């Protein structure tokens, strides 16, 4: 199983080896979750100013956040299946603030890579339909992301 990934660092502040690590982590998470071969995901690294604009425009919240996901494969009520639906899905976009990732890595006492990995997996699970609107959903999603990160080898001490 292999994702088609487009990873862009608009800030130019994330080293290439970390971007490559994000790609490996997403491939690992996709395999763990049984995602269809050829599914597409984009990851964009931005600064706080840019993610605040996106957060305000799409979520009505005028402050920077750490990660935002836009799932493209959500089935709405009454939607008709499109011809070619057997093609690999375009799962969506994950947008991560490198500024927030740095702040949170310092706050939690772990590496920037661990925080970027956490935010990447968190965003990816949202693309797969996981959420944390209820206590039950939160427990399921947070357990899943912890399992993926630990199996990959990116634990809190990383």
UniProtKB/Swiss-Prot annotation:
Name by which UniProt lists this protein: Endoribonuclease YbeY
Protein family membership: Belongs to the endoribonuclease YbeY family.
Subcellular location: Cytoplasm
Domain of life according to the entry: Bacteria
PANTHER family found in the cross-reference section: ENDORIBONUCLEASE YBEY, CHLOROPLASTIC (PTHR46986:SF1)
UniProt feature coiled coil, ranges: none
GO cellular component: cytoplasm
Top class in the EC scheme: hydrolase
InterPro entries according to UniProt: MetalPrtase_cat_dom_sf_prd, YbeY, YbeY_CS
Species of the source: Bacillus licheniformis (strain ATCC 14580 / DSM 13 / JCM 2505 / CCUG 7422 / NBRC 12200 / NCIMB 9375 / NCTC 10341 / NRRL NRS-1264 / Gibson 46)
Record-listed Zn(2+) binding positions: 122, 126, 132
GO BP, sorted A to Z: rRNA processing
